């Protein structure tokens, strides 16, 4: 049984966090100064300010956390900026397309899509979000299988990604498929929340694990043909064939999280290892639920560089959206299952793993790589981590509504900080204090080089002599023992002959 231990902080230190945000390159430092006002720079300085109050240090709760299980070099702004050089023409497009898959126009589906569009337009301020008409999974002709942990039907991600790539609108910056069906990327994996196709700006994410209650009766095995090939008769969305959906306000926020996380990947942002951030990867549902709804300052600078928004305007839009969610979305009733209660933690007999996107596939014909924010369960330890029991995420005090109101209060604090009158001297004081600190050791994502000492003939000869004498002594002792045993052993045939 796993022992419960307090979470431990994970940090690269203030100096490294400052370099990750501002950069060590003189041109990028000048770009930072010109892109942000003094108030914005002091706000972003929360990334490396040891006295920060708005952004939190990463916590490690188990030895199986994503941070420890997927070691790799963290992506700072300079690395991100260099990766954008070949993406400039595509960034001129201003439309994000959401492609519902088997999401009918019933109240639950339409309300969810409306909230997703509103959240996405606030999160990616400056881009227009268009929701395409829902398509049936049967028309996509993607592979499918029965779920291993329920009677639901799972859709294979590769067929969906191929469909999205081939039907991508000409003015699309990116296209994201949305489905309430469970997804799986490989036969050996139990499920995944999301996956994207690098180089083509298409991805897909599933909300099946975030619904207030899992489907009580999903399509059975004979229904597989409805998805693997187009049916002769009228096509019915999956919800109409047994899906019982109930999204609480908190469950809807989880859907927004995975949607914005995946769209950030499609805009070029990598996974985050700096502070608590939406762009953290996750190897368990518990880690996915613990991710915040917004970006850390380092990832926020990346997104601002791509879209060019003012920070306060973005936070004001997000604040307005959060107020609307609290006021209009159905609250969790007493006794009603929630995403926190209905979704069990991973049991000890499920191996959990997640592939890194450090080696992405570049075409549909090549092996596709789930992003490091996708959450996959392997049926065998050879797919990644062996066995893991994830702790259940605790329900925030006051229930799901209080958790959303807490985020609303955090957004209000961000707006207040950005409205403050800030002098350059305030920034200089923070920078001077951080620059005076010692630099911490920083993991580079590469194994340390093997140490090679200069050759020394004297040391080599002496070592060989010592080892040779030692082995000769052991050989003599073993020979003496064998001889003594042979002489003292009884020989029954001598008695028989006499």
From Swiss-Prot:
For this protein, the record's InterPro entries field holds: Archaemetzincin, MetalloPept_cat_dom_sf, Pept_M54_archaemetzincn
* Cofactor remark: Binds 2 Zn(2+) ions per subunit. One is catalytic, whereas the other seems to have a structural role.
What UniProt keywords apply to this chain's record, in alphabetical order?
Answer: Hydrolase, Metal-binding, Metalloprotease, Protease, Zinc
Region Disordered: start-end pairs: 332-381
What EC number(s) are associated with this protein in UniProt?
Answer: 3.4.-.-
> Where does the chain bind Zn(2+) 1?
261, 265
Question: What GO molecular function annotations does the UniProt record carry, in alphabetical order?
Answer: metal ion binding; metallopeptidase activity
Does this entry carry the keyword Metal-binding?
yes
Q: Which cofactor does it need?
A: Zn(2+)
Where do the catalytic residues lie? 262
Q: Which sites bind Zn(2+) 2? A: 272, 277, 296, 299
Biological process annotations from GO: proteolysis
What does the record give as the function of this protein? Probable zinc metalloprotease.
Record's family? Answer: Belongs to the peptidase M54 family.
- What's the name of the protein? Archaemetzincin-1
Report the source organism.
Answer: Homo sapiens
